């Protein structure tokens, strides 16, 4: 069976582009589709887009109180307990299985040798500011058509500072200590995805 699958492509954002790599890893046959016909959604703060019977694999939210999550979606696992609680609050059921599918990065993209003591992974809205403010640091751009290149750059660091959720998740997946930082107030949502 071929599954219609949706992920956010327009911003070329690291985390958003990981879904096809994860499905490939599990030999799941898929084709990109619009959200209205998606059978599967996976990586990203996209849980609010699940329709009736959409299979949700590790998606999360950006705003706890404002997002209406579809109780009729097939919630296999979600990013964290806040997303699960919101599914339940909206009348759905969801097992107590948590994790962002990006935690599988070390199996998909093996770790690179260490080159940098610190890597800074700004959210794409913060990139220019951080690049210009910290020119002497290894600033990793999450906007890349190949998200595995971003993962490789993160894996080359011994520690990560990030305003990007998937910068932190990737670091944790590779066993790299990571700290979340806010460089601006430009990131959408109520920061629930960082909890």
Role assignments for model-derived ranges:
Residues 1-195:
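Active-site anion-handling motifs in enzyme catalytic cores
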């Amino acid at each position: 069976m071929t599954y219609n699958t949706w992920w956010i492509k327009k911003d070329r954002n690291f985390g958003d582009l990981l879904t096809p790599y994860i499905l490939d890893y599990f030999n799941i046959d898929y084709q990109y589709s619009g959200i209205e016909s998606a059978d599967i959604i996976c990586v990203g703060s996209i849980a609010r887009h699940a329709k009736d019977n959409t299979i949700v694999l590790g998606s999360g939210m950006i705003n706890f109180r404002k997002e209406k999550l579809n109780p009729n979606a097939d919630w296999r696992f979600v990013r964290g307990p806040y997303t699960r609680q919101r599914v339940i609050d909206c009348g759905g059921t969801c097992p107590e299985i948590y994790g962002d599918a990006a935690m599988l990065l070390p199996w998909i993209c093996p770790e690179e040798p260490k080159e940098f003591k610190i890597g800074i992974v700004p959210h794409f809205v913060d990139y220019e500011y951080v690049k210009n403010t910290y020119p002497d640091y290894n600033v990793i751009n999450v906007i890349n058509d190949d998200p595995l290149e971003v993962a490789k750059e993160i894996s080359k660091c011994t520690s990560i500072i990030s305003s990007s959720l998937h910068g932190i998740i990737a670091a944790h997946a590779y066993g790299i200590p990571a700290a979340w930082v806010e460089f601006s107030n430009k990131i959408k949502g109520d920061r629930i995805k960082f909890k």
